[in-house]
Amino acid sequence: MLGVFGLSACDDIDDFTTSPNNLLTFSTDTVRIDTVFSTVPSSMHDFWVSNRSGKGLRCTSVRLEGGNQNGFRVNVDGVYLSPEQGYKANGIEVRNKDSIRVFVEVTTAVNHGDAPKELNDRLVFALESGVEQKVVLNAWSWDADFVRNKTITTDYTITAGKPLVVYGPLTVEEGATLTIAPGATLYFHDGAGIDVKGRLVCKGTADQPVTLRGDRLDRMFDYLPYDRMSGLWNGIHFLEKSYDNRMEFTDLHSAFHGVRVDSSDVARQTLTIANSTIHNCQGHALYVEKSKVTVENSQLTNALNNCLGVDGGDVQVNNCTLAQFYPFDSNRASALNFSALKHPLQQFVCRNTLITGYSADEMMGGKPVKDATGEDAAEPNAFNYKFENCVIRTPEVTDEEELPHFVNVVFEEKENADSVCTNHFKKVDGDKQDYDFRLAKTSVAIDRADPATATKTDRNAIPRDERPDVGAYEFKEEKTEEPNPQE
């Protein structure tokens, strides 16, 4: 039952009318609940019913026209339209210059189909005058498969088809491989995620990517889907004995930590990420601790912590876009943070990569100079790194000892953040959390990559030209239709 309370603020004495000329006013004519998974309750929606007619109005009944055939639940001014009352309430009053609030939820039945099904009902306000006023209730119901606290102990493949909604941890045990097939989408509930002790292979393609996202299909505001919010699920965690993992053409977004990689044997490849996106995370987008990881043609963007955080290991990055425009907290960290504070950094090689964001310095490096006691380290951890043909928003390196680590690097000017957004990318809209990190024609990243080391195609499998661009996306001039002179 919807536990809500009605609001009343009116004259003690009101003159009620039965004239058909006096009508209620509604804040909306249609309550749209968007898409919900069948059998899963929706979030609550509401609207106001006001009386500006000059006289008090009394409803002989307020009822669901279809009863409960489509699963809508309604509370009118604190009165639940219960099945015991025939999904209606009698004698609802709206005094002159007063308003009441109506709350609506829906839980839909299974549709027995693959496509979303539209559901409609109407909430009927029958006035004492005999006039009936109606508000449409609209929702879409989508059948899904559900897994709860699932543990995978043998090789298993998740195929495209029905949406898969995950509750709790999805654990891949040591010795098992979880394969996610092209076109599959996994929807993770709050607190759910993938814990990989064995092996994970996301086999997306340019035409059929793998999508890993939260399970909220509704909107926070009319202009803002919940899917654009961060921290909706727990992301992917690769544990210390997990090796040979691969994520290709995978879109992972709106998690807490996107991908975490625990400390492991640096002599073995733990993870390869190619042609993928990790976006809008409330923790790190990608955090690597003393592991061997390769990232190429990928977008790591918008995280409260670092878009890419590295502590030790062997990490190679090529043709990636690391962009820190996280909108929800001004204390966001950097686009890139690499260090050897806890573990030796055997090598960190970053080629043909765009590193930028709101801050004037979006790259942080942690060189070990102290030991665990805080004293000067006699033999500090190895700290080997190199940047080649990159564009980096950081103060220009002039120290002679540091210069050999930066080859053909463009250090961005200290322009304001808005200029960085518009100069580099097609769209950065923090208000609507709407982003397009493909290059704008004004970006200095265009034609700056090394043809010898750049990837042959970009994040979206678009071929790079003979003068490839820095970052995950190759710039292509968008064709505009020529005006028809006869029109």
Protein language model regions, located:
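C-terminal motif of bacterial Sec signal peptides marking the signal peptidase cleavage site
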Residues: 5-9
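Beta-strand/loop edge motif enriched in small/polar residues
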Residues: 11-17, 24-35, 40-42, 46, ...
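Short acidic/proline- and small/hydrophobic-mixed sequence motifs that coincide with surface turns
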Residues: 42-44, 54-59
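Asparagine-centered strand-capping/turn motif at beta-strand->loop junctions
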Residues: 49-53
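Short, solvent-exposed loop/linker segments at beta-strand-coil boundaries, enriched for Pro/Gly
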Residues: 65-87
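Cytochrome P450 C-terminal beta-domain/meander region
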Residues: 460-464
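Carboxylate-dense, calcium-coordinating segments in secreted/extracellular and ER-lumen proteins
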Residues: 465-472
